[in-house]
Amino acid sequence: MRPLKADLKKIYLFNPSEKSKSQKTVEIIQNILFKNRFNRDDCLIAFGGGITGDVAAYSASTYKRGIKFVNIPTTLLAQVDSSVGGKTGINNSYGKNLIGSFYQPDAVVSDINLLKSLNTREIICGYAEILKSSLLDSYQ
């Protein structure tokens, strides 16, 4: 087994905002994949919150009709919701999440140690999603 570092081809950092959740960001990511000759056996890895996961998952799902994808969510909300739901989406001028696909990640790595850096608001958002899911599940 080769060390992971030997297999890393490119790291792309972007500001995770609603503005960057766009076709432009997807195009940048996919151009990096093309430039580095990613094929269907290669894997795109997302490390970040929900926006990062959405953009990366959509990029993976539409690049060469789908490549492997691993999500490493760094927020509680992403760990309990968007990283495991299989819905990917980006925004356009008509609204949020109007372009997307259904694409389950090949793996999700949820490390609770990543949550230590979150502010109170981020933690509350995650707990609110947990509560919402619990209430909906118990109602059904």
Label each residue range with its predicted role.
Residues 42-61:
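Glycine/serine-rich anion-binding loops at beta->alpha junctions
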Residues 1-43, 132:
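ATP/NTP phosphate-donor binding region
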Residues 17-19, 45, 68, 106:
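Residue-level marker of motif borders
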Residues 13, 46-48, 71, 109:
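Short beta-strand segments
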